[in-house]
Amino acid sequence: MKITRFWKHFLASACIIGILASGLPAYAAASPAQAAPEALELCNAAATPESVISLINQIGTVTRNRRPAIVAALNAYNQLDDASKAQVSNFSILAEAQQILGIQDALAKLSVNYDKVDADWSISTPYVDKSINRKNSGIYPWIYVSENATNICMNVMFHYIGSRRIDLKQILVRAGDEKYTFDCDTSYDGGYDASLKAWFDIEAFTMEPDEISWFGEWLSQPEVIARFIGWDSTTFDYTLTAPNRQGLSDVIDAYNLLNAATLEVRVKALRNL
């Protein structure tokens, strides 16, 4: 769905300026020696349901700084047999901590801006600024989380930068055998950037739920080409670069984790970055 002119400017400015409870391999690989002294003492002893419960209670508010405490609790829990695991009455806290930490790790790769007045978050890839400074065109997905994390909206911004003025009419994305069409409105949201000595135009779109899978389809292809088409039929082809691909992948990973989480988990992850 095409974004209105107001939202296009909002999106452009923001861009420019499920891990499951059963597993956390990256965290489990860390050394328990990183944990707090009291947690380390419990780790060095043979794990019991009681010691695991104690370790879980030490996790507290989940932030990335609490990773050692989460790792210590998880490592101890994994030492238990199934019967003993069933006696860990507060395992749900550990499971939630893993999920929150997974979301926070994904968001750590991105630019996250929180608006205290509107209580919303804008999440984008830091690759945007680097790309623009290098006068590169790009495809930039962008997440908007609003109403105290109740709503999650996925958007995509197409940014043309080049030596010719192009008032965009349409954008075609070719990925493998599939072609995706984005029709632009008649307003011109571009101009000439004197510092870059280049022309630019921006078009942003809100993705419908059934369209979000397009990003995965694009990433599955070795080559993705966006054709920028002007109202005067001028065209410019942009091939997705490796950094742009990584930025797109990072945003999609974060979106999938946020979308799969409960509202409570989502709020905790976002408010404790």
What is each model feature region?
Residues 36-104:
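Beta-rich interaction/scaffold domains
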Residues 32-34:
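Intrinsically disordered, low-complexity terminal tails and inter-domain linkers enriched
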Residues 23, 27-30, 99-273:
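A generic "folded-domain core" signal
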Residues 2-14:
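Bacterial N-terminal signal peptides that target proteins for export
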Residues 15-23:
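Hydrophobic core
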